Amino acid sequence: ADEMRNVSDEEAKEFHAMFSQAFTVYVGVAVVAHILAWAWRPWIPGDEGFG
């Protein structure tokens, strides 16, 4: 598979760092959105149900 490599290790590490940061931000936004949605309208009922 070495003939398929067209990026250097340094480029791969740079891409990985950018990808990891973007993924972390994406997950963080999703978590905040879920917390806000839960505060607005919980999707798992309590003991008394949704009533």
UniProtKB/Swiss-Prot annotation:
It comes from the Bacteria. This is Light-harvesting protein B800/850/890 beta-2 chain. The keyword Magnesium applies. Residues 41-51 are periplasmic. One of its GO terms (cellular component) is plasma membrane. Antenna complexes are light-harvesting systems, which transfer the excitation energy to the reaction centers. InterPro entries: Antenna_a/b (IPR000066), Antenna_beta_CS (IPR023623), Antenna_beta_dom_sf (IPR023624), LHB-1/5 (IPR002362), Light-harvesting_complex (IPR035889). It is found in: Cell inner membrane. A bacteriochlorophyll binds at H16, H34. Belongs to the antenna complex beta subunit family. The chain crosses the membrane at residues 18-40. Keywords: Antenna complex, Bacteriochlorophyll, Cell inner membrane, Cell membrane, Chlorophyll, Chromophore, Light-harvesting polypeptide, Magnesium, Membrane, Metal-binding, Transmembrane, Transmembrane helix. Gene3D superfamilies: 1.20.5.250. The core complex is formed by different alpha and beta chains, binding bacteriochlorophyll molecules, and arranged most probably in tetrameric structures disposed around the reaction center. The non-pigmented gamma chains may constitute additional components. NCBIfam families: pufB_517_ASD (NF040862).
